[in-house]
Amino acid sequence: MTAITDLETPAVTVHLDVMEDNIRRVQAHLDRHRIANRPHIKTHKIPAIGKMQMAAGAVGITCQKLGEVEVFADAGVADDVLLTYNILGPAKTERLMALARRVPRLAVVLDNDVVARELSEAARRAQHDLPFLIECDTGFRRTGVQSPDEALALARQATARPGLRFRGLMTFPNRDPDTREFFERALPLFERAGLPVEVVSGGGTPALATVDRFPMLTEHRAGTCVYNDAMVVSSGTATWDQCAMRVRATVVSRPTDDRGVLDAGSKVLTSDLYHMKGYGHVLEYPEAQVAHLSEEHAVVDFGACAERPKVGEVVSVVPNHCCVVTNMVDEIYGVRGGAVEVVWPVAARGRVR
């Protein structure tokens, strides 16, 4: 068995004890609130981890792109999949319907009638009904219909099209009070219209902490929580000890007393900054700041640290955004007790179509 200290750097590691505890904790939390767990696999992109989540009690999985569904369907991870992306174009809708014949319970989302029309035509050609959810923008300002009235109007339009079957509403992320108020207005509208809402799907790892404020939710989709990252820690919903993904990187240069350079740049750590002050958190030197990245270098300011690393020292960096790091590498090292227990190919890496 390979020792973790023998791994060449940069190496993306996942501490298995931490990840397994994260999976159990999230499942238990949602079980307590009687909300179904539908984890988002875009974070890990690894079928073996998806199977762990299913074994822990998840009702199904969430995928963001068709390529992810294809990989996870090939691996037999789940019979129940929600694809949370507008699918457009004949090539994609053909792939979608091929998947619909393979995955017993495959549902999609949509937020406009152009998508509904194309999905309907594909479903009609395939002679296979396609369940769908209406995506609702409840404050994130990305995709989604803008009001409960628009949600109802689109649901009526889409339901009138052959091959489409309305199942419910979804959003990302849950925001209080916006999400609650949106659904509190929407659900009576659908009831009066005679359109049963079977599913109300929320999402987001930080939003796990507030699911009790949304009694209408039937399921929750969270991805980052399987690993956690600096962004989640900054939101107050995880601790550094609960961060399973850690990038091992070597100090390759110390040009000044305050400055150190690591061999993990933007091609590993990702340049996602969000509201963070640096590009990752160095566990051994918590006062350090990963000040900036180039492709193969991370420049770290150790000025606030009482101790400074030497050239050749290996450090562990919790990335800002673990989902992107996963898509940067071919394989992830699962470690336990200082040894590499498993090496997982990132099977859905690059499946962005």
Please report, for each region that a protein language model flagged, where it lies by residue.
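Generic N-terminal amphipathic, Lys/Arg-enriched alpha-helix
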Residues: M1-V14
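N-terminal glycine-rich anion-binding loops that anchor highly charged ligand groups
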Residues: V18-K51
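Conserved, mostly hydrophobic/aromatic
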Residues: M19, K42, F72, I134, ...
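Flexible, glycine/charged-enriched surface loops at secondary-structure junctions
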Residues: A36, R192-V199, V311, T326-V329
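Active-site-proximal beta-alpha core segment in soluble small-molecule metabolic enzymes
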Residues: H40-D178
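C-terminal helical cap(s) of enzyme catalytic domains, especially alpha/beta-barrels
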Residues: A73-A78, V232-D241, Y333-G334
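Active-site loop/helix belt of alpha/beta enzymes
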Residues: P131, D137-T239, C243
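C-terminal accessory subdomain/extension
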Residues: T256-R353
